[in-house]
Amino acid sequence: MSVSAVELASLAAGPDAVRRLGARRGFLGETPANRELARILRDRPETFGSVHSLVLGADEVHVPDLAASRGFAPSLQVFGLECIDGFQRLRILSDALAGLGAEHLEKATVRLEIHCGRYRDVARSLHDAGHRLVNATTAQDGLIRCPNVRWLMAGDWEKEGFFDPRRGVSAGPHRRCFSMPEVTRGLACLSLAPGPEALHLATTDEGIERLWGAVGSELYLGVFRDRMSPLGVVRAVEAYDSARAALRNLPGRLKKGAGHLIDYAPDLICWKACRRLLPLEDLHVEAGSRHDWGGMIEDQLPAVTARTAEDLVRRYEAVHRARGDGPHYKGEAELLDVWREVLG
């Protein structure tokens, strides 16, 4: 049933509410989920009960004569109440009642389940193990809500190929497969954004999760731009891979001293090299492209990347010396501020 939030708000009042309701765990305080629930209740109370139900157990539930209610919503009499699932929500409602008042809570409804008898034991058992029955949601899952990503999913990937933000890409007659991190880093490397911030963020697993979680932001839209094409995605991944391979093939003598930039900040070099050679604005042009993308990526980009590495290593040597941080390069070369200084 749907119940007015104000009718439930007092259930979790008082310091003994956890014991009194037999809840599975006490109030967790200012967790990200609880803060978000409290924010929704404060800003959009009418949507508070749209996701998940409050699950209670009871010794007895007395249902009044509906005919005698004369058109008014009947009140249930519940005895021996137990909170099987949803104590965090109950506590948030209790706090909101004190802070926002009953009139505000009347705008919110909560979906309520009450289980009795043997069904109560079954419900308790399932909810106690609920964390094992739910697939955790990640930022990557949220990509499917992005219209630019959905545009790619509907594209022609040839020969039963596909684009799936969870599984990645299978494209072309040879069924070449790219993971979603590979796709993201390739698109970030060839983005139209004026700076390398997106690619710098995507260099780590934690950073790429943050980028995926920022759907709609300026940084995100610099990577997953409007009307991307399957061919453009393949080009981006191939260009990024080609530049990275060129850096790996450089002789070890170039990777000493300031040359550690090649090992510790390879994506900075790749980003700059791609801008020196490739027509980024035409990345997603498929039919009638004026450029030989295959030739540029396979034949020209490795040499451009090597020359770019030499240029940026010289610049980094000056930056490193000016910063006066001693002989340690690793932590320094990975900093976004250092990338910006090297780019000038």
Where in the sequence are the language-model features?
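Short active-site loop/helix that positions an aromatic residue
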Residues: V78-L81, F87-H104
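Short, well-ordered loop/turn elements at secondary-structure boundaries
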Residues: F48-V51, L76-F79, E106-T109
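N-terminal extension/subdomain marker
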Residues: M1-F48, A73, L81, L268, ...
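Hydrophobic alpha-helical segments
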Residues: T47-V55, V63
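A short acidic-Thr-Gly-centered motif at the start of a beta-strand
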Residues: A67-Q77, C274
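Short helix/loop capping segments that flank catalytic or ligand/cofactor-binding pockets
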Residues: P64-L66, R91-L93, V122-A123
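C-terminal catalytic or substrate-handling cores of phosphate/nucleotide-
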Residues: A38, R42, E106-A108, L112-L280
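Short His-Asn-centered micro-motif
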Residues: L56-G57, C83-F87, H115-C116
